[in-house]
């Protein structure tokens, strides 16, 4: 599966709840396109998930759900490696080595930790604090060239680049010079950032207590229509220019979803609906969502009834990841001087 002529892409999704439209447009849809021209590893990052407490039964179920969605959305196990992070122990081993490379000051600057910890900083897990080091290990273990990232992960990838450079410098006299390639970000289009259906200023999230805030893969057609019909909007007609969207976050969100699903430019969608009321637009958006989600939902139903197949795909991905990571960890341990 590994092809040295192709650039290596690594990315992952946390199994922390029901995946939704935001995960699809913001990540998984891009994964499907990337596998055609890249050497892709798509991980279910369960070690990242437990930096915040997870119900063990739910975690096991969610892992299989993410695997199902990867496949149902179009990730091809013949073109990409799909595996569970914790089944490849070298992720944790390399994370510890990188813990010893990373400077405390670097971690202190990570804004996502500050946001997630909030005022309860003294009581959150140390795993949440060192989360970026594990992310760096995920990426560097496979000598990744490209990492798809959104706004919330850009800083972590910058840290990964710093860690890789420091490792190369620290061990330059011991075979480590230029050992890790410095991974580049694959910046996702802003239009792929999907916001809550109830508040256009907040990201669509699994953790939002309101199920009406998101479109989930297992929503039936009637529920999709209901969620879109009740999605928050403003009383004005749809605008005619992108500049008009700056102060209309809910309109911007729904139009951007339409743009991403249809493959049309946002300005073209605006031209089609300029001056119209939201009622007709919401009907058309619902139809478009159903056309995209229904085939995935039907495939999910089939996969849910074939857990043996899912486990075989994950085992195949784990074997590929182990083969590759065994080689890299042997070299890393030799460079560092570990037994």
Q: What feature does the model see in each segment?
A:
Residues 115-171, 196:
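Internal, conserved structured core segments that host functional sites
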Residues 23, 161-339:
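Conserved nucleotide- and phosphate/pyrophosphate-binding catalytic cores
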Residues 104-108, 141-148, 259-269, 297:
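Short helix-capping/linker segments at secondary-structure and domain boundaries
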Residues 2-10, 15-137, 301:
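N-terminal Rossmann-like or analogous alpha/beta NTP/dinucleotide-binding catalytic cores
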Residues 94, 129, 156, 224, ...:
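Catalytic-loop motifs flanking and including active-site residues across diverse enzymes
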Residues 16, 144, 210-212:
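Short, solvent-exposed beta-strand edge segments and adjacent coil->beta transition regions
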Residues 67, 74, 102-105, 144, ...:
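A generic secondary-structure signal for well-formed alpha-helical elements
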